[in-house]
């Protein structure tokens, strides 16, 4: 039996977040797997912000939460942290509250922490003297 407090072991290829197309546009619904996260918390935050932004992009002015959620399920994108077990973020518990309350910009900004777009200092050249 595993200790529920012990975090999952980092997969050999690092943490990955799977982006899923909720419409019928992608084979098996998979858009891509994003890799390069510093740790599990980074992957979880990216997945959460990505879904938060996707739900907001499906929202029209004055739209009730149920309609926002229906639009997201029809046209949006989901994200899940792979191989993280219960420690990995999934949209299940958060989608409804996200649909109920419009998100502040900082809760949607997945690009600021996207490992494909941001260097986290490991390979950056030194500052010129």
Regions inferred by a protein language model and the residue ranges of each:
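A short, exposed loop/beta-hairpin motif centered on an aromatic-Gly-Thr core
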Residues: 28-45
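Short, mixed-charge low-complexity intrinsically disordered segments
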Residues: 52-129
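Short aromatic-glycine-(Arg/Gly/Cys) micro-motifs in beta-strand/loop hairpins
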Residues: 2-33
């Amino acid at each position: 039996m595993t200790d529920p407090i012990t975090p999952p072991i980092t997969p050999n290829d690092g943490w990955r977040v799977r982006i899923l197309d909720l419409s019928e546009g992608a084979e098996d619904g998979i858009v891509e797997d994003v890799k390069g996260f510093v740790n599990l918390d980074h992957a979880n935050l990216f997945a959460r912000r990505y879904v938060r932004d996707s739900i907001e992009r499906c929202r029209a002015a004055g739209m009730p939460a149920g309609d926002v959620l229906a639009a997201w399920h029809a046209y949006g994108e989901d994200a899940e942290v792979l191989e993280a077990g219960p420690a990995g973020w999934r949209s299940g518990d958060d989608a409804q509250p996200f649909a109920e309350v419009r998100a502040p910009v900082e809760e949607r900004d997945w690009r600021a922490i996207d490992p494909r777009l941001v260097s986290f200092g490991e390979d950056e050249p030194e500052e010129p003297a």
